[in-house]
Swiss-Prot record:
Biased composition (Polar residues): 436-452
Pfam assignment, any one: MMR_HSR1
Compositional bias annotation for Basic and acidic residues: 24-39, 453-463
Annotated Gene Ontology cellular component terms: mitochondrion
Name the UniProt record assigns to this protein: Probable GTP-binding protein OBGC2
S-S bridge residues: none
Sites where the protein binds GTP: G283, L284, P285, N286, A287, G288, K289, S290, D337, L338, P339, G340, L341
Length: 504
């Protein structure tokens, strides 16, 4: 007959067998060494605090930073950011101060009390224009302002941080009983965001807010929320008397929503950088534009013998005209070295559309042509045609053609023929009254297809636009013909300046 097991009888034969089997299984397990035992006991969960997680950039952010460093020319002039103004501060629910005439216990008057009461000062509150008590309000939320700063050069930093928030307004400093010492909540600090000079600020897929073309220009892009009001909470039998002091009486529990501040505005902005320059240098890659800029200004752009060395516009300052003498004044001019243009740039090839839009503010255009190339005239026509296809008003501005690299033998032999052939492209009568005021001042639309670009029989061609103001030969590397080139550039600038002067 089998032996029955029962938990109340652990000393039974079956229980003893089970105990021996468990001990044998425990002895069969490999013994842990001392270091492994300590490591097992000290095993902890890795918990990272918020500051540690903030310092460790996520992989997506690291990839963005790598793309910005390698391909900065694709992002330097365009960015989309989100800004949020500060919320308004909260008001408070206040109680009326106790009235000594009604709340104090009655006691027989004495002559000594009469003198003491006469010295008690009455509480005075701030009043509104209608005589009511001015209750404290929550602070106004901080606004968001975008302003033009000369220290900023590109919009690259907005790709690393694309959201900006202003501080909220402060709450009413005290709660409880209404007192004359209460004050409004502190206003939130205005958030000022610097951008490069020449940045166009517009709502994303919306209207243009401002064109920050001059240093110090600014625009409020988001306004902070209004602070909440304060309410007086009094019993119903005292409301009529309290209405004399202030109309802000809490009549119901639902009125508490009035003490909350209003939320600040949140908008998505599109920032577009258009270089502010008086003179724009254009040409095919490796024509010598960067070398020319470094020869006549203090700018030091990257210069190499391979195409597309310049991927972002370089700026330089051209000094005043020394030929005017000490009694006359000539302001400095800003030159912009644009990246090289290729055929089909107006369609976006080689980021041409991004580069061509930086000519919008220029008043004078300088065409830099490699005189030692296989066909310099055809190179000149390619660039002119790209300007015409992108914005026809670019061709109506005064321009100078610089035949560069004349120190080479191939360019010296045909310099005079090249200058004659290029100067003959265009019409003579266009040099006068047909040049629009907007094109001289650098105020052109992005894509102007008005009736001015039409002639009888169709659109204008290159021969229907003005001829160059001058065609000069130079070698900016050998400093040959620099003075003559500067003379013609300053003459073109003077023409634009004289056109803006009002008639006496």
């Amino acid at each position: 007959m089998p032996l029955l097991l029962h938990p109340r009888f652990p000393s039974s034969h079956a229980a003893a067998c089970a105990h021996r089997a468990a001990a044998a299984h425990r002895d069969a397990r490999p013994a842990l060494r001392l270091p492994e035992l300590h490591a097992t006991r000290r095993r902890r969960n890795n918990v990272a605090c918020r500051a540690t997680r903030a310092r460790e950039a996520p992989p997506q952010q690291q990839n963005t930073a790598a793309a910005l460093s390698k391909e900065a020319h694709k992002y330097f002039d365009h960015a989309v950011v989100t800004v949020r103004a500060g919320d308004g501060g909260h008001g408070a629910v206040l109680a009326m101060p106790a009235s000594p005439s009604t709340d104090a216990p009655k006691s027989p008057r004495r002559r000594s009390d009469k003198g003491k009461r006469s010295g008690v000062k009455k509480v005075s509150y701030k009043r509104n224009y209608d005589g009511s008590v001015a209750l404290p309000m929550g602070g106004h939320g901080g606004d968001v302002v975008v302003y033009a700063d000369e220290a900023e050069e590109t919009l690259l930093r907005f790709h690393e941080k694309a959201r900006y928030c202003a501080k909220r307004g402060g709450n009413v400093g005290a709660t409880g009983t209404l007192s004359s010492r209460m004050h409004n909540g502190f206003a939130g600090e205005t958030l000022r965001i610097p951008v490069p000079v020449g940045t166009v600020v517009k709502r994303k897929k919306g209207a243009v807010l401002a064109d920050l073309a001059h240093p110090g220009d600014e625009v409020i892009v988001a306004r902070g929320g209004q602070g909440g009001i304060s309410l007086i909470d009094v019993p119903e039998y005292r409301r009529r008397k309290a209405m004399v002091l202030s109309p802000n009486i809490m009549r119901d529990v639902s009125d508490r929503v009035l003490i909350h501040g209003q939320p600040g505005e949140e908008v998505s902005l599109e920032l577009i950088l258009r270089v502010v320059a008086d003179v724009g240098l254009v040409g095919l890659p490796n024509a010598g534009k960067s070398t020319l800029l470094s020869a006549i200004t203090l700018a030091r752009p990257d210069i190499a013998d391979y195409p597309f060395t310049t991927l972002m516009p370089n700026l330089g300052r051209l000094g005043g005209d020394p030929a005017l003498g000490a009694l006359q004044f000539s302001s400095e001019a800003t030159l912009a070295d644009l990246p090289g243009l290729i055929e089909g740039a107006h369609l976006g090839k080689g980021l041409g559309r991004n580069f061509l839009r930086h000519l919008r503010r220029t008043r004078v255009i300088v065409h830099v042509v490699d005189a030692a190339a296989d066909d310099p005239v055809d190179d000149y026509k390619i660039v002119r045609e790209e300007l015409r296809m992108y914005n026809p008003q670019y061709l109506e501005r005064p321009y100078v053609v610089v035949l560069n690299k004349i120190d080479l033998p191939k360019a010296q032999d045909r310099l005079s023929s090249l200058a004659f052939e290029i100067s003959s492209i265009g019409c003579e009568e266009c040099d006068g009254n047909n040049t629009s005021e907007d094109s001289l001042n650098g105020n052109t639309g992005e894509h102007n297809t008005s009736s001015e670009t039409k002639v009888e029989g169709g659109e204008k061609e290159l021969r229907d636009y003005p001829r160059p103001q001058a065609v000069v030969g130079a070698s900016v590397l050998k400093h040959i013909g620099i003075d003559e080139m500067l003379k013609e550039i300053r003459a073109a600038l003077r023409k634009c300046f004289d056109h803006r002067l009002p008639e006496p």
